[in-house]
Amino acid sequence: MKKLHVLFLSMALILVLAACSLDNGSTSKESDKGASKDSLTIGLSISTLNNPFFVTLNEGAQAKADALGAKLTVADAQDNASKQASDVEDLIQQGVDLLLINPVDSAAVASAVEAANAAGIPVITVDRSSEGGEVVSHIASDNVAGGELAGQYLTELVGKDAKVVELEGVAGSSAARDRGEGFNKAIAGQLNVVAKQTANFNRAEGLTVMENILQANPDVVGVFAHNDEMALGALEAIAASGKDIKVIGFDATDDAQAAVKAGTMAATVAQKPEEIGSKAIEAAVQYLKGETVDASIPVELELIK
């Protein structure tokens, strides 16, 4: 009887130890899961950090990453599509969990997106889209609608049949394409575009291009620039010429808003770069946690005048 009692005690002890082992295993899995959440690494390939808009977008992304406990690794493509392809490859080799890509060129970036797809790394495009590859989501303002806002207001300012200029962004970028599409849709049959040239979203180029346009077209009365940097460059050329020309930009950077307030710039279409960056990180973390993310996440626009 004594032997039987000992046997029962031994069996009970084995069961208790087994239960403890199971509990420890469950806790370990939960800890591992929590660790993976805390150690998410997100790569951001950004078109340029030499533009206030994208600096603010990057800051919004970093702030949200910090808040959510994610690590953000940023690569500045310096407005060079080839460098961006190399940057994306580097981020893939680093083993990031997800890639945020703000394309320099929407067509050229497709191969980089496809490379990430092949490596099993999900991609979210930010502000500008990719013309190829698979993306989880696209986060941006409605650039076509923004171009329409600019076109409608410029028509209101300068009147029907007035001669105007369109300063275009980087050729091949979806932002330049979409803003131009919206602008031209709004002014069709209303305004006469006498010059349409790229200034690559750059203030210095905006100045030079506008100087040349004014020499050939001294009777221009309005300008739509695909971003504020080009608009501000155009304003310098206009000021030097002594002409009164209405200029509308896009992005609502601090300098542009100051120019609108001062009365030198007619208006700027306000994007919210900080919110775009923040939403991008938010969507990335949600996706990596297995949550559903919308294929398109819009950010509202408004006209500041």
What residues fall within each predicted segment?
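Sec-dependent bacterial lipoprotein signal peptides
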Residues: 1-18
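Bacterial lipoprotein signal-peptidase II cleavage site
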Residues: 18-37
